[in-house]
């Protein structure tokens, strides 16, 4: 989160790049959209949420904290940039990973810093409409004049957010969506939201149609004696996006307290998009009881990030919100090698055969609305046949439980 004092170059041919103080102006929206009402769980999205890994979140936070600091004016920030970009490049489901360059125009700081990182997953039917989620990867501690030697681990602020965006990309990149998704890591947030501001302004200049921006910044601290909860920060003009987000929270975690609130100090990257005319919101750990250790050498795992289960919950909800708004479509999930299965013919018409090396326990077929079409409970058989003669043409997800685990396959009915 921005403190109180306030490489391919520019992806200008379709992907472009606000930050400032606490007072957020409500710029008119550049585009208007209808937002889905989320009243029931999508089983595919629920399965993805369940796949968010605490171990993975902890490993990401631990690695980011291993740098001396991630200050945007230090030499270490370039190593962090390269590590994050390489990580996104390792995901086969992403189409492009870009470095977005920008200039720092702030007294007392060098003009050059590390880049924003943009990992792009193009939409199938509405590639010109964008759903963006992002987290800043720089950290801050101003207790010394030397930016290269000061210790600023930045666990809660904001390794937790970076870990949540990574989990979202890691899991959603296995699927196809109607709209384009951009997973972002911002630089120079801590000195005035500079990286995200540059990008959001360029997006507005290019008339990019951003349907919604979801921010992740500080979600790992929970005050002793309180239950996991969420404060959602947004301006009233963005209430349609917020209503959808609240739907996601109440549908998937109905017992979790979640409400609108406003930060008494500081700001975060969602404001960049709001000021540039895009709907945006910021889920936050607690505006009145956030980590007291941020911007110090004590912002570490265990002390400042004291509840990884809460970080997991925030990542799950971010994933679900992005997936619902982007629109799940053609499903392409890599099955576990431990669950060797075949679905054929595919595409199918009148019937489909399912063959497994291990015995099948249950076969369930869902359409892309998440509706259960058919379930068959089996007793260790290696093969079953499903009559698909009455299935409408389209794409389906076959969920297979075998004696050796669970697998998912895409099925096309002609």
Where are these regions (language model features)?
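Short, surface-exposed loop/turn motifs with a glycine/proline- and acidic-biased composition
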Residues: 377-403
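Residue-level detector of functionally pivotal "anchor" positions at catalytic/ligand-binding pockets or at interdomain
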Residues: 327-344, 350
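Active-site-adjacent substrate-binding region
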Residues: 99, 222-330
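C-terminal tail/sorting-segment detector
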Residues: 19, 393-414
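Short, glycine-anchored, charge-dense loop/turn motifs used at functional sites
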Residues: 366-373, 396
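N-terminal capping segment at the start of a domain
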Residues: 26-78, 218-221, 290-299
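Acidic/histidine-rich catalytic neighborhood of metal-dependent amide-processing enzymes
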Residues: 112-115, 148-237
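A non-catalytic alpha/beta surface segment that caps or lines the substrate-entry region
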Residues: 56-122
